[in-house]
Amino acid sequence: MNNKVNNIKITQIKSAIGCKYDQRLTLIGLGLNKINKSVILENTNSIKGMVKKVKHLLEIKNM
């Protein structure tokens, strides 16, 4: 059985100024609030959905 957890590194590359309020809340939920801030999160369905919502503001890398 493979217990390896897939992680993704998410970096905010654009500002949330001018974005909808729910997109700003999504960034905060991902742990991002400043440009060039990065977080490493588990690659779960809920995280994938949040990333998809604000993908135009992010850079995503598999780890």
Curated annotation (Swiss-Prot):
Keyword terms: Ribonucleoprotein, Ribosomal protein
Pfam families according to UniProt: Ribosomal_L30
Entry GO terms, CC: cytosolic large ribosomal subunit
Gene Ontology MF, one: structural constituent of ribosome
Signal peptide: none
GO term, biological process aspect, one: translation
Similarity annotation: Belongs to the universal ribosomal protein uL30 family.
Listed HAMAP family: Ribosomal_uL30_B (MF_01371_B)
Assembly, per entry: Part of the 50S ribosomal subunit.
Protein name: Large ribosomal subunit protein uL30
Species this protein is from: Rickettsia typhi (strain ATCC VR-144 / Wilmington)
